[in-house]
Amino acid sequence: MRIGVSLKSVYAVDDVRDGARHMVERARAAADAGLDSLFVGDHHVTPLAYYQNTAILGRLLAEWDARPAGALYVLPLWHPVLVAEQIGTLAAIAQGRFVLQCALGGGEQQFAGMGVDVRRRPSRFEAALDTIRRLCRGEEVTVEEGPYPVRGARIAPVPPEPLEVWIGAAAPPAIDRAARLGDAWLAGPELTPSMAREQLDQYREACERHGRTPTCVPIRRDVYVGATRDDVTKHAEPVVAAGYRGFDPAALVVGTVDEVAEQLRVFGEMGYTDVIVRQLVDDQDAALGSIARVGEVRSLLLDA
């Protein structure tokens, strides 16, 4: 089972340069730890500093090598030609394979702030993804109808490798869409182990219906790997007790190296091939230490 990293993009900082520096340091730590992939997220109209995906990933790739990297795009909030152009440039900067993570997105505030009707998300998503795929294959694209009409659109540079698409989804219709349209489904960080098993079964059934074979089966987890049990008690347990992101505590992966390895091994036994981790603590030194120890977790899982 591979372990990648999705870097936290939002920071409550007095100096906005500190948040960007924290992301660079975390990417460097993930590279040094030998993690298998690097990703950043996508959100808009935020009260706290949120470092936007295309720009920050371009910087983070300087810390990365030929291992896969990518970014999440909430497709209903973007014009597909613009996304395809961003992907083409990022894929040219990356030394390895570029992965597009995408999702419908949520939150009335960001949709209202971007002037997009949240009720139109599914149709906008499917139309955008189709155009992005075609552009990233090097096609000239004309679309007469729908939410994104374009005439004679093309991009350069085109990604040097075929674009791999992971679709994040939670509701049954969205999981079916991920099976129908994606190369992989990305399971969410809010899922408890029992929910993760149930949704994986739904996804497998949908893949069978649509005659699709996924390239991988990734799941997102929010984690903290402590050096000792006292470290876990000091840094992670207060965050969990405070109701981290409104998640069920069973969805969070917290413990020492051996404990976290055991928790993640369960997902491999279910059939997940990749775990994409994000640090649940804000303290930068603690997060960097946890990232380094995720590398130790990875080694334990590889040796098992």
Describe the predicted segments one by one.
Residues 1-64, 68, 163, 292:
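N-terminal beta1-alpha1-beta2 module of alpha/beta enzyme domains
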Residues 79-181, 194-206, 210, 214-215, ...:
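Internal, glycine-rich beta/alpha segment that forms the wall or movable "lid"
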Residues 49-56, 191-206, 283-289:
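Active-site-adjacent beta->alpha loops and helix N-cap segments on the catalytic face
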Residues 6-21, 71-80, 159-170, 246-258:
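Active-site mouth loops of central-metabolism enzymes
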Residues 3-7, 38-40, 68-71, 98-102, ...:
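Hydrophobic faces of well-ordered beta-strands that scaffold small-molecule active sites
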Residues 51-73, 124-131, 135, 291-304:
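Alpha-helix-loop-beta-strand connector modules within alpha/beta enzyme cores
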Residues 1-15, 107-110, 144-162, 226-251:
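N-terminal small/glycine-rich loop or linker at the start of catalytic domains
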Residues 30, 34, 60, 90, ...:
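Conserved, mostly hydrophobic/aromatic
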